[in-house]
């Protein structure tokens, strides 16, 4: 009965717009400068100007999608000012989700080079450079929480959102824009904002999709072709790349990857608001209040002109009620089935245990979040890309996980260079494998003037009801306290002022206080002083 009532209310609320003047809002990309769009939307709503369609690119896609799925300007500001949002674009993880139980003892490595011998040597491709500045670990997960319910509500058809929506991504292989009209809303927005080198691109229908601003940073053409509005309001917070500067890496990258965009709207077709920012960087999100107010004040100053072009009005209370009705129909985010791509059956069993204890047991987004960060706390899995697919039959979501396992082998390099006698070289070789349990072997050592060490470590993690870790360590260490002038010199070493340590240790680790680790161990050691 409640659903029938909501449908009747929705029909009554939406009916007056069927044959009225239609207004489309186009939002350009521009990084943090796109926060200006929120102020524009607020000013239009407060003055009863309708927004019937919305298209956007990059940051314009983020703001546009939030509005299209039923967020008010207040909702958007609250989200973009939150500590959660700061973690999303920085890639940082909350301390309570850092699972020390799965982490190894830190090593003095500067970097590691990963490789695998599973394929032929012809396909040998060591990996040691990141593909993006921002770690995607947060965005991969949060886009499920942010967009999955809206995708379920509109059944993957962006015309059925609270406001019909389009965004632009780029297919750099085929050198063309991708107009995102349907599918997973989170994927569409994520692709549209994936600025090369800054954010990692995502794969959609076997196409690697990048920031839409590469080919179309102001999609007025998509607005006209897809929605045919009577009038367009455009907000431009970006410009075409200027001549690159010798010491400005970002301007060089923009000139290499971004095509020229037409940022104009003919007077006969609509109203254009252009904002020029010289001192706002790509990630200046902390300036949201300032940028919001600039957009709001500019729109208010043009309101007489806007109202003269747009005769139709919409009641703000009516919009709020429509928004409440629309969002109340969002299916609750409850998961049941887990479908994993990129892992063998044994690995899938290991991964599933991190989320629920049985295949038919439901779990929440918080359970997903905890399991997600647990799995990524060790070195076994490099990336997990989750998607939520709604099942209307039982009103739960299937959790689809695209898993990328780390390469089995890693060479670890590190050390310390000093003008004193504390020079040190670190070198390690590790092997890891994931099946029903996770196992890792590490042989490493340090060579230096004072401290020399060789160590072997073997670790096995069991993903049981009470996760358990077993670790075996064998170590040989020498301290040489005799000081010489030559770096790394081993000649004429005296037989005094030296300490030798040898030990064998077996440790059992258990999770403690959610993200902490408790260890119990037994060992045997020998310490010998020579002086």
Task: Identify the function of each model-found stretch.
Residues 15-17, 34-35, 52, 224, ...:
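Solvent-exposed, well-ordered amphipathic alpha-helical segments
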Residues 5-8, 203-206, 389-395:
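Short, ordered beta-strand-loop transition motifs
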Residues 4-17:
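Sec-dependent N-terminal signal peptides
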Residues 366, 371, 377, 383-531:
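Gram-negative/organellar outer-membrane beta-barrel architecture
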Residues 19-57, 65-373, 377-384, 388-389, ...:
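Patatin-like phospholipase
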């Amino acid at each position: 009965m409640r659903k029938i009532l909501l449908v009747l209310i929705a029909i009554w609320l939406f009916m007056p717009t069927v044959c009225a003047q239609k207004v489309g809002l186009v939002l350009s990309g521009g990084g943090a400068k796109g926060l200006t769009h929120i102020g524009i939307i607020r000013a239009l709503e407060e003055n009863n100007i309708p927004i019937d369609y919305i298209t956007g690119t990059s940051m314009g896609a983020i703001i546009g999608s939030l509005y299209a799925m039923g967020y008010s300007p207040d909702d958007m500001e609250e989200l973009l000012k939150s500590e959660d949002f700061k973690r999303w674009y920085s890639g940082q993880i909350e301390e309570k989700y850092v699972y020390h139980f799965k982490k190894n003892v830190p090593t003095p490595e500067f970097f590691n080079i990963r490789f695998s011998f599973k394929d032929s040597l012809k396909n040998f491709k060591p990996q040691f450079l990141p593909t993006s500045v921002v770690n995607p670990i947060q965005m991969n997960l949060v886009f499920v929480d942010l967009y999955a319910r809206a995708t379920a509500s509109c059944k993957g058809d962006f015309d059925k959102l609270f406001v019909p929506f389009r965004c632009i991504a780029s297919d750099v292989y085929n050198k063309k824009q991708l107009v995102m009209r349907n599918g997973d809303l989170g994927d569409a927005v994520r692709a549209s904002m994936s600025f090369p080198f800054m954010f990692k691109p995502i794969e959609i229908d076997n196409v690697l999709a990048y920031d839409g601003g590469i080919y179309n940073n102001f999609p007025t053409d998509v607005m006209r072709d897809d929605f045919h509005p009577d009038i367009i309001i455009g907000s431009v917070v970006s410009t075409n790349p200027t001549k690159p500067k010798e010491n400005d890496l970002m301007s060089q990258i923009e000139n290499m990857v971004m095509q020229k965009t037409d940022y104009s709207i003919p007077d006969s077709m609509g109203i254009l608001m252009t904002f020029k920012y010289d001192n706002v960087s790509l990630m200046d999100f902390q300036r949201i209040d300032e940028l919001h107010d600039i957009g709001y004040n500019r729109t208010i100053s043009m309101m007489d002109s806007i109202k003269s072009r747009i005769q139709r009005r919409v009641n703000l209370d009516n919009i709020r009620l429509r928004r409440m009705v629309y969002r109340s129909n969002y299916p609750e985010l409850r998961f049941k089935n887990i479908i994993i791509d990129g892992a063998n059956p044994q690995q899938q069993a290991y991964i599933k245990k991190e989320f629920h204890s049985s295949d038919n047991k439901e779990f929440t987004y918080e359970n997903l979040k905890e399991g997600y960060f647990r799995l990524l706390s060790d070195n076994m899995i490099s990336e997990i890309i989750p998607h939520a697919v709604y099942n209307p039959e039982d009103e739960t979501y299937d959790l689809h996980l695209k898993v990328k396992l780390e390469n089995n082998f890693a060479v670890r390099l590190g050390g310390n260079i000093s003008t004193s006698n504390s020079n040190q070289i670190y070198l390690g070789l590790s092997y890891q494998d994931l099946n029903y349990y996770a196992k890792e072997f590490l042989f490493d050592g340090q060579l230096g003037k004072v401290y020399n060490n060789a160590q072997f470590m073997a670790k096995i993690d069991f993903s049981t009801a009470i996760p358990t870790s077993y670790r075996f360590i064998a170590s040989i260490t020498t301290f040489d306290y005799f000081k010489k002038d030559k770096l790394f010199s081993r000649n004429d070493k005296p037989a005094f002022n030296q300490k030798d340590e040898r030990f064998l240790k077996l440790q059992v680790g258990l999770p403690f206080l959610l993200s902490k680790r408790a260890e119990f161990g037994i060992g045997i050691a020998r310490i010998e002083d020579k002086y």
